[in-house]
Amino acid sequence: MLHKAKSSADSLFFTFDLATLIANMKQSPSWENGELNAMILSKSPEKQIVLTALHRGTEIRSFQSNDSITFQIIEGKLDFHSKKDSVTIDEGQMLTLHENIKYKLTSMEETVFLLTTANTIPVTVESNCM
């Protein structure tokens, strides 16, 4: 469940009940059909946070992203492979990946993680002041 702070239209933060969100994801028809399940929790031009649930044996091959990426494992574990290295990320661990790196993930068991992407390309704001 998403909880907005103090119901103000211009709140500065949001809170999420991850346990409830995960339980709801695992009760969805797509999950029961063996599909991965993902939910965008926050999205802006600078950052995106996605809660993702994978079945055991799910493999994800990346594209070469221009963003830096962080995987925070909430449940389960992932095998992470890049051209130069391999590592297993366990529950409670986090992996940060720089931009422009191709990778492959394999869930070793039912796994839930937060995927955060951060835009590393500077945003330029132009001003037409006279």
Label each residue range with its predicted role.
Residues 33-35, 45-65:
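Conserved short histidine dyad/triad with adjacent acidic residue
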Residues 58-60, 94-95, 99-104:
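Histidine-centered metal-chelating micro-motifs
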Residues 99-123:
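Ligand-binding loop in jelly-roll beta-barrel domains
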